[in-house]
Swiss-Prot record:
InterPro entries with a match to the protein in the record: CS_DNAAF11_C, Leu-rich_rpt, LRR_dom_sf, U2A'_phosphoprotein32A_C
Listed name of the protein: Dynein axonemal assembly factor 11
Gene Ontology CC: one annotated term: apical cytoplasm
Record's compositionally biased regions (Basic and acidic residues): 187-202, 265-283, 407-430
Cleavable signal peptide: none
The protein's role, per its UniProt record: Involved in dynein arm assembly, is important for expression and transporting outer dynein arm (ODA) proteins from the cytoplasm to the cilia. Acts as a crucial component in the formation and motility of spermatozoal flagella.
Subunit structure: Interacts (via CS domain) with ZMYND10 (via C-terminus).
Gene3D superfamilies: Ribonuclease Inhibitor
Length: 472
């Protein structure tokens, strides 16, 4: 049974920021509501109310909606127009396709002086002889009836024939009430028959269940050990048999002819609810429970697990003597949903309850490890120092040598020349014995005579000028 709750109204009040006390428009159609309640207390400022395609059997609890202008109750189980006198601002009322057989109940709308439009098509009263004339004459404030404008001449004729038309309407109402009483009795009888059939079926299945229990008690012990293998097959067969029976019952229900009455609509709703519950029950049985993820074997060996299916990179930083894990965690995920646990031989990261575990290539120090998260990519970086320290010598840095264009040319020319294995005699390391004693003695530089300047014989026109000092 669908009920009007505060949560239901709030979910349909998103256009008003889920505030219900100031709502002016509310739509509760197709919610399987069977009773009107709470709306007049929670939403007193309503102007438009949609309640079509439900199972409402009576108009009630709307008398406090003074500002209500449009009320839609089409496709419901309403049999009488009532309790609308308090809706002072009502201008449009839609009661299409209901079960209104008491046409005289429209007299309760005479106090709604602002009512301009009324829809009663699809109701049993709309088939009465003189239906339109009676409504037009009774509700003189109406401008439209069933989408057709009421003309002045039509109202004058209806008022003239009102006593005769009213008498005919009363006779047809009595005939409809008798027919309706028979329909109710027939529906009650069918309901009792179905309940008795259901009780018989339950008792039959209960006896069958006891028989299976007795049979299982007489089985040998070695069969009991195989019970866990046979049970799923038996259960699957029972589920299939139940599905087949339910399918047959469903076909029988939908193929069975029935009258269009409020009881038949309620019966259809109950049948659909039962189908939905059975389907949910079967789906729960078929649903396989996942076994818990094994992270460590029985012998204490850790396993590699990546249940969240995240990309990762594991680097061995020899320079800093540590292992770095870069885990591609979702960028906009809250850090509180991540839990890191570093062990000497493996690292475990819980991402939203899903484990990521990786075995490390070397033993690390859990106390010295740390984790940080990138603010740009959201990746999680875990740095884990190794246990064994490695001493690495510092490498001398070579000074940069400036290169000149001449040196580069010399290097290219040297590379182009052919290198031979002959040794230059001037670069020998063996001393020259012949030149140990010098024959000529070197005179001091001051004692040495100045060289004479001899004019060049090659130039015949040379004339020596004594005034010019020698160029030494």
């Amino acid at each position: 049974m669908g009920r009007i709750t505060e949560d239901l109204i709030r979910r349909n009040a998103e256009h008003n920021d889920c505030v219900i006390f100031s709502l002016e428009e509310l739509s509760l159609h197709q919610q399987e509501i069977e009773r009107l309640e709470h709306i007049d207390k929670w939403c007193r400022d309503l102007k438009i109310l949609y309640l079509q395609n439900n199972l409402i059997g009576k108009i009630e609890n709307v008398s406090k909606l003074k500002k209500l202008e449009y009320l839609n109750l089409a496709l419901n189980n309403i049999e009488k127009i009532e309790n609308l006198e308090g809706c002072e601002g009502l201008t449009k009322l839609d009661l299409t396709v209901n079960f209104i057989g008491e046409l005289s109940s429209v007299k309760t709308l005479q106090g709604n002086i602002h009512l301009k439009e009324l829809f009663l098509m699809g109701n049993p009263c709309a088939d009465f002889d003189g239906y339109r004339q009676f409504v037009v004459a009774t509700l003189q404030q109406l401008k439209w009836l069933d989408g057709k404008e009421i003309e002045r001449s039509e109202r004058i004729q209806a008022l003239q024939n009102l006593p005769v038309v009213e008498q005919r309407i009363r006779e047809q109402e009595k005939a409809y009430c008798l027919k309706r009483a028979k329909d109710k009795e027939e529906a009650q009888r069918k309901l009792e028959e179905e309940e008795s059939k259901g009780e018989m079926g339950r008792s039959h299945t209960g006896s069958g269940g006891h028989w299976h229990a007795d049979l299982s008690a007489t089985l040998p012990s070695f069969e009991e050990s195989k019970d866990y293998i046979q049970a799923p097959e038996i259960e699957e067969g029972q589920c299939k048999g139940k599905e087949f029976d339910d399918r047959e019952d469903d076909l029988e229900f939908w193929n069975k002819p029935s009258l269009y009455t409020p009881e038949s609509r309620l019966e259809t709703l109950r049948h659909m609810e039962k189908q939905r519950r059975d389907q949910e029950r079967l789906s729960e049985k078929k649903k396989k429970v996942k076994p818990p993820r094994m992270l460590v074997t029985e012998d204490g060996r850790a396993l590699n697990v990546n249940e969240p299916k995240l990309d990762f990179t594991l680097k061995d930083d020899e320079k800093r003597n540590q292992i770095v894990l870069d885990l591609a965690v979702y960028r906009y995920m809250d850090t509180s949903l991540i839990d890191v646990d570093v062990q000497p031989t493996y690292v475990r990261v819980m991402v939203k309850g899903k484990p990521f575990q990786l075995i490390l290539p070397a033993e690390v120090k859990p106390d010295s490890s740390f984790a940080k998260r990138s603010q740009t990519t959201g990746h999680l970086v875990v740095c884990m120092p190794k246990v064994g320290e490695v001493i690495i010598g510092c490498q001398r840095t070579s000074k940069p040598v400036k290169s000149t264009p001449d040196s580069s040319k010399e290097q290219t020319s040297k590379s182009q020349q052919m290198e031979r294995l002959e040794v230059d005699p001037s670069k020998r390391s063996i001393p020259d014995v012949a030149n140990i004693v010098q024959e000529k003695k070197h005179m001091p530089r001051r004692v040495c005579a100045e060289p004479k300047i001899i004019p060049s014989e090659e130039d015949p026109d040379f004339e020596d000028n004594p005034e010019v000092p020698p160029l030494i």
